[in-house]
Amino acid sequence: MVSLNTPLCDFGWKAIDFNLEGVDGTYWNLAKAKGPHGLIVMFICNHCPYVKAILPRLVKDIRTLKDLGIETIAIQSNDPVNYPEDSFENMKLIADQFNFSFPYVMDYTQETARSYKAICTPDFYGFNRNLELQYRGRFDATGRGEAPSDNVRDLFEAMKLISETQRGPLEQKSSIGCSIKWRE
């Protein structure tokens, strides 16, 4: 497993549209996914220990952010042929197991991950209502272990600020995770 860190936020970068199939049978794009105050686009997968470590807390925070007008879409871009745990069928199982309240979509061609310059899972992009990037950072300090007792909810706090001001925090810490598994 290769661990990578994401680059920091390119403030104002405009979200690139996509049309990806969700585990709910719906095709999702930016217009359908975004909330009145913003959108989280996150690249996750099923097998990465960094994602597994945060998933229960991530799902909980996303539910709270929804009440603040922030919607979320999760994109799985890993090669499911070489990583069968990341198959579409297994995505459905994870979404059901954790009771996802957000769309979980498959990036079969990996074009969306490439257009966003996604590096790893998890990789978080926080956009304001105009779909301008305001946050590209970590979920929290967990890494792939237990959450520290003094855990700061970086993504939650950033998106709460974006919902209130449409601007992200100037100080951001990069996400760390497993490399995206590119097709050959």
Task: Show which residues each predicted segment covers.
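Chalcogenol-based redox active-site neighborhoods
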Residues: M1-S163, G168-Q172, S179-E184
